[in-house]
Amino acid sequence: MLLSVASSGCMGLAMQRELMEGMRDDPREEIVPVEPIVQAHIFAQNECILPGTESYSQETDCYSNESVILVDETVSKMLLDFSVSFEWSSTVGEFLGNNTDELRFVEITLLKPNGDKCWEYLATSSVGQMALELRSESDCTISIGNSSGFTNGNWVLQVRARGYALSAPIDTLSFEDEFRVSLWVTKKCIVFPEIHSDGECTFSSELE
């Protein structure tokens, strides 16, 4: 009698375990964005010296920086967006001619791990929000590569810029040149319903 009850209890636990296993949702794959790298700058008064003046001794770009983003085989897209604000850029261009890229500019370059250029853009006037989407290296505009994905390794975002600011007694004459550049990738991410809350997942590259 005792043996029968014990056996029945063990069978009950096994059946409950199987039932619970059957009720679990299967893991699912999602494509999610990775935290972007951002380069943003607001120029201060006298930060960049106007070329041609007596005190001018700067390089052409008084802002220069680069950021690295790691790309692996799980990356499905690379996305970049940027904006540039140059007050009175059209007026300055008409007054000084077409060489305003020596005075005010933002140059954005995306480099592959081997140093080849994938994409670049030169802004010499204000630019509203613009975006670039790369689904593979075949979408590069300079050095086209792998059509089925991206080369693994460190991709580099380079930004060079020159801008100005003026704090005038009359507010309408004051201005601050500025820009913002963001680069990020989307990657495969696995959701395990039994351990992840809403919005959570584990990147597949971390499971390998």
Predicted regions: what is each one?
Residues 19-57, 200-205:
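Glycan-recognition and processing domains
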Residues 16, 25-31, 110-112, 146-208:
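C-terminal edge strands of extracellular/lumenal beta-sandwich accessory domains
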Residues 53-127:
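Acidic, Ser/Thr/Pro-rich low-complexity intrinsically disordered segments
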Residues 19, 55-62, 69-70, 127, ...:
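Extracellular/mature segments of secreted proteins
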Residues 1-28:
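Secretory targeting signatures
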Residues 122-151:
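Beta-sandwich interaction modules
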